[in-house]
UniProtKB/Swiss-Prot annotation:
Record's catalysed reaction(s): Transfers a segment of a (1->4)-alpha-D-glucan chain to a primary hydroxy group in a similar glucan chain
Subunit structure comment from the entry: Monomer.
Gene for this chain: glgB
SUPFAM superfamilies registered for this protein in UniProt: (Trans)glycosidases (SSF51445), E set domains (SSF81296), Glycosyl hydrolase domain (SSF51011)
Catalytic residues identified in the record: D437 (nucleophile), E488 (proton donor)
UniProt cross-references to NCBIfam families, sorted A to Z: branching_enzym, PRK05402.1, PRK12313.1
Keyword Metal-binding: no
Species: Synechococcus sp. (strain JA-3-3Ab) (Cyanobacteria bacterium Yellowstone A-Prime)
Family that this chain belongs to: Belongs to the glycosyl hydrolase 13 family. GlgB subfamily.
Group of enzyme by EC: transferase
One GO molecular-function entry: 1,4-alpha-glucan branching enzyme activity
Key words of the record: Carbohydrate metabolism, Glycogen biosynthesis, Glycogen metabolism, Glycosyltransferase, Transferase
Protein name from the UniProt record: 1,4-alpha-glucan branching enzyme GlgB
Pathway annotation from the record: Glycan biosynthesis; glycogen biosynthesis
Length: 770
């Protein structure tokens, strides 16, 4: 039941101090004594005249102003119902009435009828357990009584008033005010006539009267930087073709599968000229590189995916593709967690990219940043005039070194925002894994802080973040079995990849940062001095099976003056390439899944520069082209040899032959689950040829050389074992048989045992038998 407005109430309403516009605007039934009549109110800022137009007859009824150029009202005679109508207005900037505006009155649709956020939704959200809240909050195109529009909803519990602003209302927050839904802190409104592609923001009026214009935290798309508006997007318009891939993924144990990841920053992998615009016209220039543009998601699908498939990688890992305002952050300072960045195209374009990858047998992993967010005014910071998403105390809620804010993991709605976001990427974009950034910064309350607040037990462990990770990973694997949840955790925090029910964090992989640092420190040394630091090569096997590890040479290792991979290797050109091949060979035979950053596959000299694309011209030179061929060969070896992946996380999958040869040589065996699947690996990290090097082996027979990193085809010297070696009946290294090998300089050898009878019957070995 409606009511007549006093002058004071009119002033409150037109100054956005009302929390239920539906009680004032639209059709209102008024009762005065025994008399009952209907009236319609409309808030139209900067209107010279407003009409209510009866749809059936076209009759226009002028509305009377209750407040100059803002609030208008039309009363109907008692007993006269409100007809089906729309509104028409003449704005003050159109004195001649040449450009009248017409629109559907959003407030003629009762919110109870159009609102799809029920009491259960609000309860689960406030409890922190609404796993698909992204289907409720944000902007969602819907149809009501045949009228197309968008349902907007946002969480801002401490705001005095919230409105939707956009081109459709001249960015005036008075026209489309939202209604507060009970005590949930959620505000909602249905705006007819708005559809996909419309740019909008939320105008948030704080309790202190300040007004902020905020992007939608749950928005599915945003404008290309430097613009900051959200864009209405319908994520249901793309038709997927990857059902077979998804079914196979759900039935596969990734820990027993070959995983080799190509880490990519989409904005700097490859560029195009602005004189060669994309077919869809979505041309976004690269900052600091004139006459150059980004490739679109669809162009990347045509170029990047075939490239990755040719090299044999199993997955592509994308540096963050959630919307971020600053290119120089590499994507790690996210504003729109639910919006795939518009730099490279639309949400449907990104779906196409993932779909194409799946059709080519390649998984897609996305870097995810729940540890912090930037302070940009249009983002999450101080969202409703209070520290809503972040901790209020800067000793807990701010990363001084990064200039960013920390999510309040103890607040139900914030935790829900992040966990639902992780599930959203699997649900809507069919991704195959998340690589969670900067986990250590979340686990420790004193991480990079001089002043910090201890937990309730006096310790430095961030208990709320620990609970967050456990809930996150439990839900990821509940809904999406077979996917990856990878932790970038740079400390020795225990049980990162252990199940949550035994006290672990629940990830299924963790980057092995210790192995990476040890190996880079070792290979930086002159080979002569490596003999004095042999422990750097072998130490990783002391803990290799305490977690499920991924060996990663990531983007962080080729920036900020660290030099690129070749630049880390000592010696002349030949020795640099030989050392890098030996390192990659050891990496691909060492227990653990693999990750290489883009450009490492062909040996770029320059450090990674986010403003430039890769130095593709290097591939015209033989050493670089053959290094790329070598990486492709390693990937093919990994895929074809179960001994290299089925027991990556089990101590049964590894045995040292000799780890104590301080001349810089190691040898070991990798075992598959099938007892007949095993490989012998020998690494010579010195520039010396060892022509009569003997190692012990467990079985008599012929050992075929599957890989020699010093082969001529890889730009090596060609020293080797002529395809393989027969065993000698001499025990060695506490094993019953032995091989006498010729070890090439700076090399990795991989040999596969063949039983004597099989070897003798093999045509490729007849010459050696003779």
């Amino acid at each position: 039941m409606g009511f007549l407005l006093s002058a004071e109430q009119v002033l409150q309403f037109v100054t956005n101090q009302w929390q239920d516009p539906y009680a004032v605007l639209g059709p209102q039934q008024i009762e005065q004594g025994e008399t009952s009549f209907w009236l319609v109110r409309a808030l139209v800022p900067n209107a010279k005249q407003v009409w209510l137009v009866e749809r059936a007859t076209g009759q226009a009824y002028p509305m009377q102003p209750l407040h100059p150029e803002t609030l208008f009202e039309l009363c109907f005679a008692p007993g006269t119902p409100v007809p089906d109508y729309f509104l028409r207005a003449q704005r003050v900037w159109d004195p001649e009435g040449q450009h009248l505006e017409e629109w559907e009155d959003p407030y003629r649709f009762p919110l109870e009828k159009v609102n799809h956020i029920g009491e259960l939704d609000r309860y689960l959200f406030n409890e922190g357990n609404h796993h698909r809240i992204y289907e409720k909050l944000g902007a969602h195109p819907i149809s009501v009584d045949g009228v197309q529009g968008v349902h907007f909803a946002v969480w801002a519990p401490n705001a005095r008033n919230v409105s939707v602003i956009g081109d459709f209302n001249h960015w005036d927050g008075r026209q489309h005010q939202m209604k507060r839904l009970g005590e949930s802190g959620i505000w909602a409104v249905f705006i007819p006539g708005v559809g996909p592609g419309a740019v909008y923001k939320y105008e948030v009026k704080t309790a202190w009267g300040d007004i902020y214009e905020k992007s939608d935290p749950y928005g599915f798309q945003q404008e290309v930087r430097p613009k900051t508006g959200s864009i209405v997007a319908d994520l249901h318009t793309y038709t997927w073709h990857d059902q077979e891939w998804l079914e196979k993924r759900a039935a596969t144990d990734p820990l027993r599968s070959p995983i080799s990841v190509y880490e990519v920053h989409l904005g700097s992998w490859m560029h195009a000229s602005t004189e060669d615009p994309p077919a869809d016209g979505h041309l976004v220039p690269v900052e600091q590189k004139p006459n150059t543009r980004f490739l679109t998601y669809r162009e990347l699908a045509d170029k990047l995916i075939p490239y990755v498939k040719e090299l044999g990688f199993t997955h592509i890992e994308l540096l963050p593709v959630a919307e971020h305002p600053f290119d120089g952050s590499w994507g790690y300072q996210v504003i729109g967690y639910y919006a795939v960045t518009s730099r490279y195209g639309s949400p449907q374009d990104f779906m196409y990219f993932v779909d194409r990858a799946h059709q080519e047998g390649i998984g897609v992993i996305v870097d995810w940043v729940p540890g912090h967010f930037p302070k940009d005014g249009h983002g999450l910071a101080f969202f409703d005039g209070t520290h809503l998403y972040e901790y209020a105390d800067p000793r807990k809620g701010e990363h001084k070194g990064w200039g960013t804010l920390v999510f309040n993991y103890g607040r139900n709605e914030v935790r829900n925002y992040l966990i639902a976001n992780a599930l959203f990427w699997f649900d809507k974009y069919h991704i195959d894994g998340l690589r969670v950034d900067a986990v250590a910064s979340m686990l420790y309350l004193d991480y990079d802080r001089k002043e910090w607040i201890p937990n309730c037990y006096g310790g430095r462990e961030h208990l709320e973040a620990i609970d967050f990770f456990r809930q996150l990973n439990t839900l990821i694997f509940k809904y999406y079995p077979g996917v990856l949840s990878i932790a970038e955790e740079s400390t020795a925090w225990p049980m990162v990849t252990w199940p949550t029910h035994v006290g672990g964090l629940g990830f299924n992989l963790k980057w092995n940062m210790g192995w990476m640092h040890d190996m880079l420190n070792y290979f930086r040394m002159d080979p002569w001095f490596r003999q004095f630091h042999h422990n750097l090569v072998t130490f990783s096997l002391m803990y290799a099976f305490s977690e499920n590890y991924m060996l990663a040479f990531s983007h962080d290792e080729v920036v900020h003056g660290k030099s690129h991979m070749l630049g880390k290797m000592p010696g002349d050109l030949w020795h640099k390439f030989a050392s890098l091949r030996a390192l990659y060979g050891y990496m691909f035979t060492h227990p653990g899944k693999k990750t290489l950053f883009m450009s490492m596959e062909f040996g770029q000299w320059n450090e990674w520069n986010v403003w430039a694309d890769l130095d593709w011209e290097l591939l015209q030179y033989e050493p670089h082209a053959k290094l790329r061929h070598y990486v492709a060969t390693l990937n093919q070896l990994l895929r074809s040899q179960p001994a290299l992946y089925t027991q990556d996380t089990k101590p049964e999958g590894f045995r040292w032959i000799d780890c104590s040869d301080h001349r810089g040589i190691i040898s070991f065996i990798r075992y598959g689950e099938d007892p007949r699947e095993w490989l012998v690996v020998v690494c010579n990290f010195t520039p010396v040829v060892w022509p009569n090097y003997r190692i012990g082996v467990p079985q008599r027979g012929f050992y075929r050389e599957l890989l020699n990193s010093d082969a001529v085809e890889f730009w090596g010297s060609g020293v080797g074992n002529l395809g393989g070696k027969w065993t000698d009946d001499w025990p060695y290294h506490n094993l019953p048989y032995s091989l006498e090998l010729c070890l090439p300089p700076l090399s990795t050898l991989v040999l596969k045992w063949q039983p004597p009878q099989l070897a003798e019957d093999s045509g490729e070995n007849k010459a050696m038998l003779e």
